[in-house]
Amino acid sequence: MKKFLLIISIAAGLVACQGSDQKAGKPLSQEEKDKAVNDSSNFTTIQWLDSTVKELGKVKEGQVVEVSYRFKNTGDRNLIIQNVSASCGCTVPEKPDKPFAPGEEGTVRAKFDSKGRPHGEARKEVYVNANTKPEQQHILTFKVEITD
């Protein structure tokens, strides 16, 4: 009986630890990120703590501004940001390299360079691909008004 309980305990421990091979806090290779995003057993959920649409106001042509979007891993698996890209070359996003443990918060940042951009309103998008459900791609938007 004791042997049976020991075997059951070990089996339960192994099942509980499945999927924990990606340690939160340790940077992952692009191959590891790609694998996690393509394996639905590793999917988690994300909550954007800030609005996903931001109004940055007036920006003088030539000025560089930074925008940040905070998020929280609300699932039960590590959150892995596979890729972060922008709608044009004037916006350079910064991709977090490490996984985020359940309950952990993080930030996606992007810099917008208004140099040489036409005056008036500009709307830019940042695309975040992650191992999330129900959607794997998240669109973050910011608006600026470029002035003299």
Predicted regions and their residues:
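Positively charged n-region of N-terminal signal peptides that target proteins for export
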Residues: M1-F4
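C-terminal motif of bacterial Sec signal peptides marking the signal peptidase cleavage site
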Residues: G13-A16
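Beta-sheet-dominated interaction scaffolds and their linkers
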Residues: Q22, L28-S68, I146-D148
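Surface-exposed binding patches on compact interaction domains or structured appendages
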Residues: D76-P102
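Terminal connector regions
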Residues: K23-A24, G120-T147
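Short, surface-exposed loop/turn segments at beta-strand-coil junctions that are enriched for proline
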Residues: D113-H119
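Asparagine-centered strand-capping/turn motif at beta-strand->loop junctions
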Residues: F71-G75
